Amino acid sequence: STVRYKVGDVEYTRTAFASLADDVIILRIESNKKKALSFSLGYDCPEALQPQVSVKGAQLTMRCKGVEQEGIPSALNAECLITIKADGKVKAVAAEGNGSKLTVNDATAATIYIIGATNFVNYHDVSGNAAKRCEEMMKKALKKSYQQLFAAHVEKYCEQFDRVELNIPMTKASEAETDVRVKNFNHSDDLNLIALLYQYGRYLLISSSQPGGQAANLQG
């Protein structure tokens, strides 16, 4: 997804995607003026998950544990890593408790790499090493530029998405915003909306469930 917005006379572009090819969430932020991008980034996690946040180099780590369910203690634990590449100054700021952050100053563009993993292997095996999984995936992702990561993700996604086409001609009603199209559907000739929502459903399924993972209807 891509969002563009203005703050004063500076235009910012923010692009986010979860890569099917590299198991990393990428958030790219760009400004149309040099050195106009500054921000800080940290974790906000419910205390029930017993989060532990730490910084090492330019990497921010959070470890947490699953919560008890119906009197049964959780055997799950998770880890999340965040690393930032930017053309400005990237600094790790350690703080007490879970307030540690990464800061970016005087940048024009920044790429945020987010990796998450758990010790879950399957429904009767939780012997996985969340920390090792995260480290291996982050090491792999950092070898690629933003452009390489984006291209690899699109190529992998299209292997599935491009299998099916549904073409229904657009009408004047199809030019409206999507929420307006949905609201007016029963009283319009906007049959192209059927194709749009059909492909949206495919996008959701492809993005939420892949071979080796959990079925979409088992994800909460």
Residue ranges and their predicted role:
Residues 1-220:
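Aromatic-residue-lined binding/catalytic grooves and analogous aromatic/hydrophobic interfacial grooves
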